[in-house]
A protein has these predicted regions:
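Helix-rich effector regions associated with P-loop NTPase G domains
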Residues: 1-26, 34-43, 47-53, 66, ...
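Alpha-helical scaffold segments in soluble metabolic enzymes
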Residues: 95, 99, 135, 208, ...
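Residue-level signal for short, function-critical loop segments
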Residues: 33, 59
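Conserved active-site beta-strand-loop modules that form the wall/rim of enzyme catalytic pockets
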Residues: 87, 137, 167-170
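Glycine-rich phosphate-binding P-loop
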Residues: 122-142, 172
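Short, structured loop/turn "capping" segments at alpha-beta junctions
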Residues: 107-111, 138, 144-150, 217-221
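Structural beta-sheet core signal
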Residues: 29, 55-57, 125
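Canonical P-loop GTPase G-domain recognition
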Residues: 61-126, 145
């Protein structure tokens, strides 16, 4: 599996995020609810240097709710504010500002005690590619998407989007790379669409997805493709061929693989979480 991230790209991305940190009060770290650990940057704590953080578990509508609750607890224990959202339909988005204020309550109180006027909270959205950063920015900005220009005390050229009167977001999200060394993580990222399709063999990813659903969500898999208990006992390659035939693709393994991947990705097999708390959250 070849990934298009090189040391030069990583250094540049890290530098760009680090340079912007000084302008914000808080960082909104966006993760995919289906893989809340695998969709994080491996050097994030080092990059953010203790900056207050709100972890936004995005695409919560596609994730297993019981797993999401456990991951919320996990991030809370790490000392982060956390909120499950779905940036596509605004679910949870209205709670972002109150959560950010909650995370910054001590700082805001100190400013008030010093006699400083109330001001908008400044934030930056960061995350790996395809986790929903731009969608979230557009959702918060609404139709107006008014850039506030160069705010006082901010380096010239930093463009901000105002959300109501209490929040200003850097217009450009911080893009970071996921951890690719682990093949398991690579497959998870591919299955959810975080990696371009041409970068992997589709049948490998389809087989990985089927293996996962057989282990954790067999009833959802059976329901989607009208499978019997006997079908679920087949080897995964044989099961993929059976599904391929059931979908009317005869023996076109590639088309069958594409269908399985996109069905999983689009939530047609139901809600699921690839990063299992019981395996990765301790």
């Amino acid at each position: 599996m070849t990934i298009q991230w090189y040391p030069g790209h990583m250094a540049k991305a890290k530098r760009q995020v680090s340079e912007k940190l000084q302008f914000v009060d808080i960082v909104f770290e966006l993760v995919d609810g289906r893989l809340p650990i695998s969709s994080r940057n491996p050097m994030l704590d080092q990059i953010l240097q203790g900056k207050p953080r709100l972890v936004l578990i995005n695409k919560a509508d596609l994730a297993d709710p019981s797993q999401t609750k456990q991951w919320e607890t996990y991030f809370n224990k790490q000392g982060f504010a956390v909120l499950a959202i779905n940036s596509q339909d605004n679910k949870g988005s209205k709670s972002i500002l109150p959560k950010a204020k909650e995370a910054l309550v001590e700082k805001l109180q100190r400013e008030q005690q010093k006699g400083l006027k109330p001001r908008a909270i400044r934030a930056m959205v960061i995350g790996i590619p395809n986790v929903g950063k731009s969608t979230l920015l557009n959702r918060l900005a609404g139709k107006k998407k008014a850039k506030t220009g160069n705010s006082p005390g901010v380096t010239k050229g930093q463009q901000w989007i105002r959300y109501k009167n209490d929040l200003e977001l850097l217009d450009t999200p911080g893009i970071l790379w996921p951890k690719f060394e682990d093949q398991e993580i690579g497959k998870k990222l591919a299955l959810t669409g975080a990696i371009k399709e041409q970068l992997f063999h589709q049948d490998d990813i389809a087989l990985y997805g089927l293996d996962f659903f057989i282990q954790f969500y067999p009833e959802q898999l059976a329901k989607r493709y009208q499978l019997t208990q006997e079908d679920l006992q087949l080897s995964t390659p044989d099961l993929l061929m059976l599904i391929t035939q059931k979908q009317g693709f005869q023996e076109d393994y590639e088309k069958g693989s594409q269908r399985v991947i996109h069905d999983i990705r689009d939530g047609k097999l139901g809600k699921y979480t690839l990063d299992r708390y019981e395996e990765m959250g301790e």
